[in-house]
Regions:
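Beta-strand-rich recognition/accessory modules
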Residues: 12-22, 203-315, 340-349
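Short, Gly/Pro- and small/polar-rich lid/capping loops
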Residues: 2-14
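Acidic, contiguous internal or C-terminal segments within carbohydrate-active enzymes
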Residues: 102-174
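Acidic-aromatic substrate-binding/catalytic surfaces of carbohydrate-active enzymes
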Residues: 14-122
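Polysaccharide-binding surfaces and accessory modules of carbohydrate-active proteins
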Residues: 155-230, 347
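Short, well-ordered beta-strand segments enriched in hydrophobic/aromatic residues
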Residues: 19, 23, 134, 145-153, ...
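C-terminal beta-sandwich/jelly-roll accessory domains of carbohydrate-active enzymes
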Residues: 301-364
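Short, acidic/polar linear motifs in exposed loop/turn regions
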Residues: 153-157, 279, 325-327, 339
Length: 364
């Protein structure tokens, strides 16, 4: 049996990054409509399915709850419902940044892409410049990629969250291209429920604190057609999700918000996801359990690291795991490492060979 070709990544037209593994093809565009994986470019080689989205893991704003303390946010309408919020740092990354910095590296059995940008405007009393950084890892042998969004604050925030599209909005015409939606905190929902527009708080809304915390945070749609898979977004730590929408507004809006935590200047918070194709809900659950509770991703040419907390690079082969904002830190930290090489994390030297789970001590 012939061996699979190694993973590949190249720069194409307009600086786009073109990625290919044995299971997936994808593109990341740092110009135009930016962040995440470009709309309709995530191709499942097994089924030829595409994502039918506006993009996967797409980034918007830094926001806060309620009407006080920031730039006004329109609500009491069909698009935003009756949920009061305000903007803290803006503009919207996906539509208004126009260009984000990016790089990529090809490892032995994966491709890693990084994108980053700083918000240019801020609400009164705050300063602009908080950093958004996104890391995407495309492993061989998997029909999904691993993604992580990290925010590093330049402000003292009492209660901040990041708005994302996760896995990504679904473009459709009266349910023509999907059979059903699955939300782990609610269940299976037929396509017929998304024929007419309704607000995010009309139905299928998840809010941390008012809804039970699910054991898994899975949001997926079943692509229509014989042999077609589910496209899913799995947030590996359900507790980092503060709100999630699944409502119809000409398309199915899969907004997901992460955080709602206090931060000091220099603090970071992050969430990690699996995004891609699965043949069953049971398969999604197995992969969610495989990396349950992990929130942050970093990578070199030799290995990738998926950890609790927020993993930060301190130098060549040296990393530090920090708490999520001002939330208390567990001790020790759990870390999954994949690849081959050596890494120093919180002062502990790790030898990585294959995919292994480690415990790393707390370090200030």
């Amino acid at each position: 049996m012939p061996q699979a070709q190694p993973p590949r990544a190249t720069r194409g037209q307009d600086e786009r990054i073109v990625i290919e593994t044995d299971c997936l093809a994808a593109e990341v565009w740092p110009n135009g409509y930016v962040s995440g994986v470009k709309a309709n470019t995530l191709v499942d080689k097994k089924s030829s399915a595409r994502d039918a989205s506006f993009g996967l893991d797409i980034i918007d704003f830094l926001m806060g709850p309620g009407t006080e303390g920031g730039v006004a946010y329109e609500f009491n309408n069909l698009y935003h419902g009756k949920i009061a919020k305000h903007y803290l740092e803006l503009p919207q990354v996906c539509t208004q940044a126009k260009h984000v910095e990016s790089d990529f590296v090809v490892g032995g059995d994966f491709v890693v892409v990084r994108q980053w940008w700083r918000w240019r405007k801020a609400a009164p009393g705050y300063k602009p410049g908080s950093l958004w950084e996104q890391t995407l890892v495309f492993p061989m042998g998997r029909r999904y990629f691993i993604s992580c969004d990290r925010v590093e604050s330049v402000n003292d925030f009492k209660d901040v969250f990041l708005r994302t599209d996760l896995p990504g909005h679904l473009q459709h015409k009266r349910g023509d291209n999907f059979e059903e939606v699955y939300l782990s905190y609610e269940g299976r929902i037929p396509a017929s429920d998304f024929l007419e527009d309704f607000p995010p708080d009309g139905r299928h809304l998840y809010q941390r604190g008012t809804h039970p915390l699910p054991s898994r945070m899975i949001r997926a749609r079943k692509i229509k057609g014989e042999g077609k898979p589910w496209l899913a977004g799995i947030t590996l730590d359900p507790a980092i999700v503060c709100e999630a929408w699944c409502h119809q507004r000409g398309y199915i809006c899969f907004i997901q918000e992460i955080g709602r935590l206090p931060m000091k200047p220099g603090d970071s918070f992050a969430a990690a996801y699996l995004i891609g194709y699965f043949d069953s809900i049971e398969e999604m659950e197995r992969e969610a359990d495989r990396y349950r509770g992990l929130t942050s991703l970093a990578a070199t040419k030799d290995y990738w690291l998926l950890s609790e907390g927020v993993i930060l690079r301190d130098g060549d082969g040296r990393f530090r795991i920090a708490p999520q904002g001002q939330w208390p830190a567990p001790s020790p930290w759990r870390l999954v490492a994949h690849g081959k090489g050596e890494a120093e994390i919180n002062g502990r030297r790790l030898k990585i060979d294959g995919e292994q789970t480690f415990e790393v001590p707390w370090a200030k």
